[in-house]
Swiss-Prot record:
It catalyses: apo-[ACP] + CoA = holo-[ACP] + adenosine 3',5'-bisphosphate + H(+). Belongs to the P-Pant transferase superfamily. AcpS family. Transfers the 4'-phosphopantetheine moiety from coenzyme A to a Ser of acyl-carrier-protein. Mg(2+) binds at D9, E58. It is found in: Cytoplasm. This is Holo-[acyl-carrier-protein] synthase. SUPFAM superfamilies: 4'-phosphopantetheinyl transferase (SSF56214).
Amino acid sequence: MAIVGLGTDIAEIERVEKALSRSGDAFAERILSQSEFERYQGLKQKGRFLAKRFAAKEAASKALGTGISHGVTFHDFTISNDDNGKPILTLSGKALVLSQQSSVSHIHLTISDERHYAVATVIFES
């Protein structure tokens, strides 16, 4: 296995919370996939959840080498959790096509947050 992509991102939770207060769920709908949005709707700490998802998707787009551009959107990345809480990143759309072109066979994702920030790192391996 070889690393074919590495990305990291940090998001300020308060900034995400302000965006939510300005635009409401429209901001969340722009960032989250349908399954993520359904989970988000039942949460108390929506800003924290969204900041972690935002950081993870930005990190994934950087690992892909495109950022959120060139046809890659936030909806191309879905984050779920396994039974132990480990985050799982699933690709779709243009992100999936580009990852297949780079022979990505394994994705590593870690997400962490503390009082003011959420951070994520993504590694793509072939």
